[in-house]
């Protein structure tokens, strides 16, 4: 097994453990045992549990971005749906991983950088698909940023409470996206029509 193959194997095993156990209950010894390697070898690839988790979460973020391509040739709601479904599916299958990143390690700068980088990439793709320019693009950019944070919070609430189902999460998120973009367009139209507001 090449070093890259070994590393990928360790990531896969770690991902399985973090997906089903709280962060504090995942031990590096368990990862090494499942992989059939010594702890010393595991630590050569990942100096600690934090580094292992960060590598797993970064890999997941990259995969989700690959599944979240936005085609400007189709309506935005349709273009976004596939990426939203991919994220919801990942959250459902990796509940403990997502809660670890957003709750247990919410103050970890490495994890937060991974989350912020993904959100920034998603916003840029969606914004480009809107084909806007100037001030209207700036308003839509802020609206999309707010929407992406909303989706994150909505999914975390769903994972933690289970007070609503996946279909409701999806429906609310898509409806909120359309409302946010419509509001951004309305604000732009109002600003253009109101000379006093333009001066302000």
Which sequence ranges carry the predicted segments?
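N-terminal intrinsically disordered/low-complexity leader segments
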Residues: 1-5, 187-200
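Alpha-helical structural segments
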Residues: 5, 9-16, 20, 34, ...
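Short amphipathic helical patch at the helix-1/turn junction of helix-turn-helix
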Residues: 22-23, 150
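Flexible coil/turn residues that form the inter-helical turn or adjacent wing/linker of helix-turn-helix
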Residues: 24-25, 45, 162
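Append "Primarily bacterial transcriptional regulators
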Residues: 26, 30-34, 42
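Amphipathic alpha-helical packing segments from all-alpha helical-bundle domains
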Residues: 109-134, 141-149, 153, 168-182
């Amino acid at each position: 097994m090449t070093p890259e193959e070994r590393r990928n194997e360790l990531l896969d095993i770690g991902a399985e453990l973090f997906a089903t156990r709280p962060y504090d209950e995942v031990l590096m010894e368990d990862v090494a045992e499942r992989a059939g390697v010594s702890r010393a070898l595991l630590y050569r690839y990942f100096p600690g549990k934090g580094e292992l988790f960060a590598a797993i979460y970064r890999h997941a973020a990259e995969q989700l971005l690959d599944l979240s391509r936005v085609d400007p040739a189709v309506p935005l709601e349709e273009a976004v749906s596939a990426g939203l479904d991919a994220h919801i599916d990942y959250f459902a299958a990796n509940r403990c991983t997502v809660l670890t990143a957003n709750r247990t390690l919410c103050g970890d700068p490495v994890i937060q950088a991974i989350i912020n980088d993904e959100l920034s990439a998603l916003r840029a793709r969606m914004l480009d698909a809107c084909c806007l320019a100037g001030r209207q693009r700036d308003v839509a950019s802020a609206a999309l940023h707010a929407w992406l944070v909303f989706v994150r919070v909505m999914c975390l609430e769903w994972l933690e409470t289970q007070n609503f189902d996946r279909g409701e999460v999806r429906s609310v998120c898509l409806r909120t996206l359309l409302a946010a973009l419509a509001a951004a367009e309305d604000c732009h139209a109002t600003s253009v029509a109101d000379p006093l507001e333009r001066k302000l």
